[in-house]
Swiss-Prot record:
PANTHER family assigned to the protein according to its UniProt record, in alphabetical order: LIPASE MATURATION FACTOR (PTHR14463), LIPASE MATURATION FACTOR 2 (PTHR14463:SF5)
UniProt-listed Pfam families: LMF1, LMF1_C
Name the UniProt record assigns to this protein: Lipase maturation factor 2
Sugar attachment sites: 489
One GO BP: protein maturation
Transmembrane segments: 10-30, 74-94, 102-122, 126-146, 165-185, 227-247, 259-279, 312-332, 364-384, 399-419, 637-657
Compartments (UniProt record): Endoplasmic reticulum membrane
Residue ranges of the region described as Disordered: 660-703
Signal sequence annotation: none
Amino acid sequence: MAGSRVPRQLFLQGVAAVFMFAFASLYTQIPGLYGPEGILPARRTLRPQGKGRWQQLWETPTLLWEAPLLGLDTAQGLELLSLLGTVLALGALLTRQLHHPLVYLLLWAAYLSVCQVGQVFLYFQWDSLLLETGFLAMLVAPLGLPPNHKQAPQGRPGGVSPHEGLPFWLVRWLLFRLMFASGVVKLTSRCPAWWGLTALTYHYETQCLPTPAAWFAHHLPVWLHKLSVVATFLIEIAVPPLFFAPVRRLRLAAFYSQVLLQVLIILTGNYNFFNLLTLVLTTALLDDTHLAAKSSTSRRKRMPSSWPKALLAMLTLLLELAVYGLLACGVVHYFGLEVDWEQHVVRSRTMFTFHQLSQWLKTVTLPTMWLGAASLAWELLTALWRWVQVRGSLRKLCAAVQLSVFGTATVALFLISLVPYSYMEPSSHGRLWTGAHRLFSTVEHLQLANSYGLFRRMTGLGGRPEVVLEGSYDGHQWTEIEFMYKPGNLSRPPPIVVPHQPRLDWQMWFAALGPHTHSPWFTSLVLRLLQGKEPVIRLVQNHVPSYPFHQQPPTYVRAQLYKYWFSHPWEQGQWWRRQWVEEFFPSVSLGDPALDMLLRQFGLQDKSPPRAGGSSNTLSQALHWVRKQLSPLEAPALLWGLLGAVGAIKVMQALLGPQSLPRTKEEKHKPAPQEDSVAASKQASPAPNISSGSQTPRRKKSP
């Protein structure tokens, strides 16, 4: 069986990179979102209620409770955590010495602390996904065994612990839950766009932050959009069970299908770090053999030499072909695929009913849980077999302790995850073991396992609703307040901001889907714009002179609701077209009774002003200095700058101190090729230990 040492290293590096992006992206927005003059000041969320310290920490698990001990308020504590998280993640990305469980525990704890006070701006599925992935990374991070001076068994590197494959299996299970649920909820929501296979005819222009490529994708033929929806259902519903296939080529095919989907989403939409994190999860489908990039000669040497092995290889190939054929027949049958040779199109339509889907879901939900349990049982048996091979009493004892702890943790996390996974099918949720429910309810607030289901319903079927803020000095001449990232100016192309998530722009998209009373924070945004608070202005326009009211705050602010569509191909110089719908938020000014009433209704009036004197604290002054240095940079530039710095350092490390990646188990014990030894023997040399050892081992590019 191929090992997974290199994929685990890639996973840990990928998680570190995503944490770096998440912390740095949030850091740039903290003053405007959570500062004393922000939209939703964070200090309102952490108010002692007379409970004990540990009880308070358990009920609201955040390190920000300790911020006053450092002389910081809650917002400054957020900045400190974000900066430390960015630096720690950057270090883990650059050096493997920081691929330690404690490092990933700190990253997870810091992000959990941030999410506890993030309120509506951190209520996204990818924030929950990052927390769950970060906790798994803590378990995946290697814990070596004591050194062994005796030779390790064939195929077993001496420092590898038997339990290391168990937590990494949970990553595969998480990827399965994410993709399978995301596909199923599109149909269980009864959204007519998904059932009619027309979702992508709307998606590209109605998603929150499209990219320029989305404009071109939107104008593709309708039949291709519908075929793409069919492919999406195939990749998200039919392919994920192959994650647990015993045939590795089936797992690799599943891997490449998931990568294809995520890359296409990245090209057409700005979904911050979500798709990057999903790509990181797909490393659980890889193995060392696939990443070793061995030559064709070595592949020929692995061809079966005996007839039992040849028969097994033939049966495996037949199984692969049967699976591919079954998938193809299923897609053709359930989506009515037909080739229209006259029109040169592929026609598709949904050939099943909602009742049939519900019955199918009742049939497969519990079996998929048992599939996961069977796969986990195999991993446990494999880990036990590896433990049997450990040599040395001390090493065997340490390995037994590690296997017991991590095996128990793996089984417990699997049981916990079954509860949110079963949300998509109520009857299966009710039949789940009560112990799993109790275990989940105990740790639910830690977000160790979450339910997922992205793009449940397609919005904006009649055009994307968009809120446009306007300001005025006299109440007659109105000037639009243009945001940096969300659609507004008809002639401005959609930006590329990934992996940054502009949290305010995202919430403006959600606000447009309903009345402003469904988004209480919007009233606070209007108040801050009337007050001319610079931290909030920087969320709208980081370059303050680009903000139309940078010299003097507007006297009046209102909001209009428009419907936006992508422009037609023949409309030169425009990316969008729009139509006015209605007034979204009435014209208000400071002291307006209507505004004051809304602030009281939503509890947004600030009754406890921040304490003065915090600026004299040395740590507070240091945070202020860092903020002053970084504030001129736009968030995407900062994040891409960090990534560029990592790339440059990696290149310098490769040039100045080349070190090969950890070799796979097969490579470590692979004898030198015969032709190399023969060639070496022809070179007369008094030092025979140089002849065969001078060959530089094949190196893989650093990830």
